[in-house]
Design a protein with these regions (language model features):
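Phosphate-end processing signature that detects enzymes handling 5′-triphosphorylated RNA
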Residues: 1-237
Length: 237
């Protein structure tokens, strides 16, 4: 039974982020819709859940904090109910210089939230009795479940389709190193900020001039995975 299928590699692009206060959400949305790029809502808002994997050295965090020119993050992503992961997507998020892209792998997995640990928390979608070790589908350098991050995403796109924008809010972080069992209950909420991200091909960067002025948008580094693991940073400082 093929548990991982349909590999997709996304185009390389710029991903520019800025953190705003939650009370600015309505204003941000209005400015996007009224901008010269005439953004429009293109997809229903939804909750995104990402289970991040790393290693005992926390190398993905170290690369991000140090600003390494080449980075990789490994995560399983699904949408909607936190404990209802069916056919999650395995994502390798890659970055080289200023450009980011993903390797996406469809899976035929279903989460068993009552499992005694993450490594055997998934079964085959078509056969509940077919348990597997999640390490079997993960890259060998990122096999330890570290953090479960959830947030609510709003989707927008410019009128010509050349720029995508997302606004993320209601972030929550669940440390998966606290216990052997999957941790869905103990969480740290962050409802004080929203994250605006602009996604575009490098050749379209010139289109942002007026938009970034109106949005008071100065790109800054922000990683949800890094934010989720701040309590562990003493381990590599």
């Amino acid at each position: 039974m093929a548990l991982v299928t349909d590999k997709t590699i996304t185009p390389k692009r710029l991903e520019l982020k800025k953190v705003y206060s939650t009370y600015e959400f309505a204003s941000l949305k209005k400015r996007l819709l009224l901008s010269n790029l005439r953004f429009r809502k293109t997809f229903p808002s939804r909750q995104i859940n990402s289970l991040y994997f790393d290693n005992s050295e926390y190398s993905a965090i170290d690369d991000s904090i140090s600003g390494s020119s080449e980075r990789k993050k490994t995560r399983l992503r699904w949408y909607g109910d936190l404990e209802q992961a069916i056919d999650p997507v395995l994502e390798l998020k890659l970055k080289k210089g200023s450009l980011s892209w993903k390797e996406l792998y469809s899976t035929s997995l279903k989460l068993k939230p009552s499992a005694d640990n993450w490594l055997n928390a998934f079964t085959a979608t078509e056969n509940d009795s077919h348990h597997l070790n999640i390490k079997d589908i993960l890259p060998p350098d990122h096999t330890i479940p570290i953090s479960l991050v959830s947030y609510y995403r709003n989707y927008f796109e410019s009128f010509d389709g050349r720029i995508r924008a997302t606004i993320d809010m209601n972030l929550s972080y669940r440390d998966q190193t606290l216990q052997r069992q999957p941790n869905f209950k103990i969480q740290r909420m962050d409802s004080s900020k929203v994250i605006l991200e602009l996604k575009l091909a490098k050749e379209n960067l010139n289109l942002l001039r007026d938009l970034t002025y109106n949005l008071r948008f100065t790109p800054q580094r922000f990683s949800k995975y890094c934010e989720s693991t701040f309590q562990h940073r003493v381990k590599w400082r």
